[in-house]
């Protein structure tokens, strides 16, 4: 794969690349600016207009990403990447900063700030997502029946600081296992403690297994330079975030993934589950479970034009119990 770093192609198809004659050192700067026009209409759900005056909100123009960075390889086994998202603020300005040492195809170590091993939607190569926004079911915070302003988890874990081992076995089985801070993309400092309940480091423990029967699945949701692929991916991922949300909860996540590339056609579907259980100090015995998922597809109707659609489903309330009692 020429995008095995999960960031941008090193094969020289886009932009330019600096490398030594022997090819043992490759350096590639890149720039990605994403602009979008947004229109969102929200159902008032029968509420009085005095309390919910506008059905149209969060609409207009936006620049969610203005990424400047560089990536590359050294000594034939070390990959690296550093990128800044000028459209973000605070700690999220530093989007990625990591190095990856591949001892062999079956075993590599990655250290720094990078994507946690959860969800095909997040793990897609920079700039090659089907739609400009991630599924809302991954990014929207859940609603809990307590006035705890610091407890607003969402299912997606996104970027984080940590260490991960990963590899590819028999050119069809992939694995990723890592330890992360569990504080997300906006925090670049070490702020974790030991769990008072479980007596283990209060970190994010995450893993992902993939099966790709037709060879390595490119981490793309549509690339006009790759219209002759025939690949398929099945994935299972899970994580436990110990004492997350300001040491208030222990969050468990499980996800199922499917993705397919067949010439001009791309299809994907994911389903994910999150259980939010409170730490003993909160004195809340009840836990809350949430389900979400989406299906999406894209088709290149012209060499550089891809039509896309997504159906996203998510109930921000404790919808496992809603399903059981309905």
Language-model features: where?
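Short coil-to-helix leader/linker segments, especially the first N-terminal amphipathic alpha-helix
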Residues: 1-17
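Outer-membrane beta-barrel pore domains
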Residues: 2, 22, 55, 98-102, ...
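Short, structured loop/turn "capping" segments at alpha-beta junctions
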Residues: 7, 217-220, 267
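Short sequence motifs at beta-strands and strand-loop junctions characteristic
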Residues: 8-10, 58-62, 89-91, 154-157, ...
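Outer membrane beta-barrel
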Residues: 15-185, 201-216, 226-227, 296-317
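Outer-membrane beta-barrel translocator domains and adjoining extracellular loop/strand segments
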Residues: 41-49, 87-98, 123-127, 186-195, ...
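Active-site rim elements
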Residues: 83, 150-152, 192-196, 241
């Amino acid at each position: 794969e020429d995008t095995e770093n999960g960031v941008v192609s090193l094969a020289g198809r886009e932009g330019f690349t600096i490398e030594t004659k022997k090819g043992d050192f490759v350096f590639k700067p890149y720039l990605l600016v994403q602009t979008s026009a947004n229109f969102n209409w929200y159902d008032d759900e029968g509420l009085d207009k005095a309390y919910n005056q506008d059905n149209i909100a969060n609409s207009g123009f936006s620049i969610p990403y203005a990424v400047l960075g560089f990536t590359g390889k050294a000594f034939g086994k070390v990959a690296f990447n550093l990128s800044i998202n000028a459209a973000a603020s605070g700690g999220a300005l530093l989007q990625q900063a990591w190095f990856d040492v591949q001892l062999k195809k079956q075993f590599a170590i990655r250290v720094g700030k990078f994507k946690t091993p959860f969800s095909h939607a997040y793990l897609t190569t920079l700039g090659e997502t089907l739609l400009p926004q991630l599924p809302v079911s991954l990014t929207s915070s859940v609603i809990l029946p307590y006035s705890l302003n610091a407890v607003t988890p969402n299912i997606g874990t996104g970027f984080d600081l940590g260490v991960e081992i990963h590899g590819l076995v028999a050119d069809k089985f992939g694995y990723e296992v890592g330890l992360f801070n569990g504080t997300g993309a906006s925090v670049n400092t070490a702020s974790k403690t030991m769990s008072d309940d479980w007596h283990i480091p209060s970190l994010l423990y995450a893993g992902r297994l993939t099966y790709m029967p037709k060879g390595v699945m490119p981490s793309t949701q549509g690339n006009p330079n790759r219209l002759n692929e025939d690949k398929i991916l099945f994935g299972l991922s899970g994580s436990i975030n110990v004492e997350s949300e300001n040491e208030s909860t222990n969050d468990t996540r499980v996800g199922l993934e499917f993705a397919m590339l067949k010439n001009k056609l791309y299809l994907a579907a994911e389903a994910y589950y999150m259980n939010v259980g409170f730490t003993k100090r909160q004195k809340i015995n009840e836990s809350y479970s949430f389900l979400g998922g989406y299906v999406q597809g894209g088709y290149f109707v012209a060499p550089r034009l891809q039509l896309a659609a997504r159906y996203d489903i998510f109930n921000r309330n404790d919808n496992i119990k809603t399903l059981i009692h309905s």
